[in-house]
Each structure stands twice: as structure tokens, then as C-alpha cells.
């Protein structure tokens, strides 16, 4: 009797590891949440078909407010799988769930899977040069968060790249595009006027990471904001100081303007 946090990877049902698949198949009950990320290349039916068992999909409210009522009682009596997109422990929500499981006396295990934190290397930007990441959230009435702007500023001062996750409103089937994120960041720039994110800022967009044909594009905001990057999920990267190999990679594989080679 235990709770297994199992990652599904980034794109489709085939991204789950062999260990994760075997574990899910032996579990007596399977729950899943998809409000922290999106698997664009698959469906719930295909995941169920691969595992061979029905999956109970949980909402944000189910997970964050009723985990002790819905999932933990089951895990005290049988083996239970909790499926998540990406790697289970990347989302802070899931770390909290594991703490709650331990406090309830439920043994838990983590089975890793491909994560955006590793997949972002397909852009050619060196992983060790990434600083703190942040999420660009949709502004709402009387609420316009800007902390991600400050994260970009802090990272750039140290020459580091910034990985920006884009807001998800799964219950509304609303997934922020890189274009929307750039528009929001330009609005914040208009408010703060610190020259951190302008039409001349170099950005990198990675769409559908984990697929065989992800979209990787690099260029200046003034040009990129009008591009079509295809289906979500998207992530936006604001590069810091580029190494010559990083710049060459962006030119060759992401269509970056060759003039960036003159700046390294």
C-alpha cells in the first residue's frame, strides 16, 4: 500500500518511462491531474489504453483542497498512482502533496520522467547558465503580477538565461502563448521603464517540447511577437550573456539573426 507519483513526460503517452508504466499497471487505482501542464500530443483515452486501466482525472480543487479526502484514504488501503505531466516533483504543488501524504502515514515514491528543465537544452542554451525561472501569469482585474520581470532583471545582471513558464487555466481550456507572454511583458516594461524587456530584446520560444518536431525560434521581440509558433504548450526564454556556441546554435537551429554572433 503506497502512493506513487509518476511523471508522464512532456508530449504524448509514450513519454512515460518503462518503470513508470509498469508501476502504473500494477496499481489498484489511478488518479491524474493536468492543470499544472499540458500533454499536447495525446488524450486521456490513449493514456488509459496504454496503461490498461481507467484514470480518475482530478481538478485543481480536488488536488489542492481535497487530496486528504480523495486520494490519501485510497493509498492507505491499496497501491495508488498519481500521474502528472512532466516530472512529478518539478511542480511545487506535488512536493506539498508528498508532505501531506507522509503526515498522513502514507508511504510514497517518485518515478521521474522527461521535464522541461532538461528539454529546454534543445534550444542550444547551456543548462548551467540558467538562473531562477518564473511564470508569466494572466493579469486579472485588480491583480497584475510583475515578479517575473524582476527575475529577468536579476538573471540578466548575472549574465544568466531566464526560463519563463506560461500561465495555464486548464478549467477554461486557456493556455498562454509566447505571443501573449511577450505582450504582457511589454506592458510591464511600460509600467517599470527599466529597459529589461523591450522590442529589441532577444528571446527564444520553444513550443511542444518533447515532440519529434518541436518549434524552436529565436529573434527580437518586435519580430517574434507576430510569429505563429503553433499549438501550445510554449515556453519563453530570455537569454543572458551568450557563449559563441550558443549563439551559433540559435542561428543554425532557431533562425536567430546572424548579427547576434557579433555580440559574443
From Swiss-Prot:
GO terms for biological process: methylation; protein histidyl modification to diphthamide. Keywords: Methyltransferase, S-adenosyl-L-methionine, Transferase. S-adenosyl-L-methionine binds at residues 10, 87, 90, 115-116, 166, 209, 234. Pathway: Protein modification; peptidyl-diphthamide biosynthesis. It catalyses: 2-[(3S)-amino-3-carboxypropyl]-L-histidyl-[translation elongation factor 2] + 3 S-adenosyl-L-methionine = diphthine-[translation elongation factor 2] + 3 S-adenosyl-L-homocysteine + 3 H(+). Homodimer. S-adenosyl-L-methionine-dependent methyltransferase that catalyzes the trimethylation of the amino group of the modified target histidine residue in translation elongation factor 2 (EF-2), to form an intermediate called diphthine. The three successive methylation reactions represent the second step of diphthamide biosynthesis. HAMAP family: Diphthine_synth (MF_01084). This is Diphthine synthase.
